């Protein structure tokens, strides 16, 4: 009885639309054919700055390259791998990461991140990534990206602010 009474006084739940929204068209279909193919590679090399260390956020921690900055280099390498092959006006954005940070490197170390496109379907891309310093692999994994149109992407991002 209590349950029925509560159910009657509860506010109605908003109903979901009967039809799912239409899947957006791949950018390639909108802006011409893409030249993307497995095997495209990109890389970036940078010297580790103090601002990129975990110690820059908490001085009690070691002055070594932070995981987010290592991943950022991997993301840039992935974006550069396909930049010249994207449809005009398109960009790629990160959607998911699966990365292991294997070794620490100090300020002043040179880090090279490499990315290789291994899968693509429509606007979705998968890269194998690796970061190294000298002969040491310091991180490896997978980066997932999507091809988007910048104006629509930015408008959608702004629509989520309150």
Model region roles, listed by residue range:
Residues 1-29:
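Polybasic, lysine-enriched low-complexity intrinsically disordered terminal tails
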Residues 30-66:
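Catalytic strand-loop segment that frames the active site of acyl-thioester-processing enzymes
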Residues 45-49, 100, 142-144:
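Generic structural detector for well-ordered beta-strands
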Residues 67-71:
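Conserved N-terminal beta-strand and adjoining loop/helix that marks the start
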Residues 72-76, 80:
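Short, residue-level hotspots on alpha-helical faces of the histone-fold
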Residues 79-112:
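Hydrophobic beta-strand-centered segment that forms part of the acyl-chain substrate-binding groove
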Residues 106-107, 116-162:
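HotDog/MaoC-like acyl-thioester-processing domains
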